[in-house]
C-alpha cells in the first residue's frame, strides 16, 4: 500500500489536472491505496443471490497480480486494476494493458483522462464521479443495497446530490 504522502506526490505529478483530494478519495474507495488491487466483475448470469457481483483481490506483488489477471481473462470476465481501478474495457481506448495499470503513475494518468472526461460530460464533480464509477452520471448517486444503501459518491465522501455545483 502506498502512504498518503507518496500517493499525493504521485497524484500531483501524474494526474495534475485533478485535485489531489479527489484522486485520494477515489483511490481510498477503489483500492485502499493498493497499486495491485484487482476487482473481478462477475457477469450477472453467473452471480448467486445476494452476491455483490465483484470479487476483490489484494496481491502483494505485480507478479502475483498478473497471475490473477491471467486467470480472470481465461474466464472471460471483466476486471478493474490498480490504485484507481481502471476497468479492462478501457484498456484499448487508452492504449494500455493490465500490466501497465499496475504502475501507479500510469494508472493515475489514465484515471485523470477518465475523470476529466466524466467531469466535462456530467457538468459537476458528483455527476463526474458517478460517471467514473459506472460510465454514466446517474448510477453512482443511487444507493446500493450491497454497500449498506450508500451510493458511490457517498462512499467517496459526498452527501446525496443537492444540485450544488462541485468542481474537479
Task: Set out the residue ranges of the language-model regions.
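Non-catalytic cell-wall polysaccharide-engagement segments
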Residues: 1-22, 32-34, 55-168
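Flexible glycine/serine/alanine-rich "lid" or loop that lines and gates the nucleotide-sugar donor pocket
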Residues: 28
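Early exported N-terminus immediately downstream of N-terminal targeting peptides
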Residues: 23, 38-53
Amino acid at each position: 500500500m502506498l502512504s498518503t504522502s507518496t500517493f499525493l506526490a504521485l497524484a500531483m505529478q501524474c494526474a495534475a489536472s485533478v485535485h489531489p483530494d479527489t484522486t485520494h478519495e477515489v483511490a481510498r474507495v477503489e483500492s485502499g491505496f493498493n497499486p495491485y488491487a484487482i476487482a473481478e466483475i462477475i457477469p450477472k448470469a453467473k452471480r448467486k443471490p445476494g452476491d455483490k457481483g465483484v470479487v476483490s483481490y489484494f496481491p502483494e506483488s505485480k507478479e502475483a497480480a498478473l497471475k490473477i489477471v491471467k486467470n480472470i481473462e481465461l474466464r472471460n470476465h471483466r476486471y478493474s486494476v490498480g490504485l484507481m481501478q481502471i476497468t479492462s474495457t478501457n484498456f484499448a481506448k487508452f492504449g494500455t494493458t493490465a500490466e501497465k495499470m499496475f504502475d501507479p503513475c500510469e494508472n493515475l494518468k489514465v484515471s485523470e483522462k477518465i475523470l476529466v472526461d466524466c467531469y466535462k460530460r456530467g457538468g459537476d464533480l458528483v455527476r463526474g464521479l458517478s460517471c467514473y464509477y459506472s460510465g454514466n452520471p446517474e448510477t453512482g448517486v443511487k444507493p446500493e443495497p450491497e454497500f449498506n444503501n450508500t451510493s458511490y459518491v457517498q462512499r467517496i465522501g459526498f452527501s446525496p446530490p443537492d444540485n450544488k455545483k462541485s468542481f474537479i
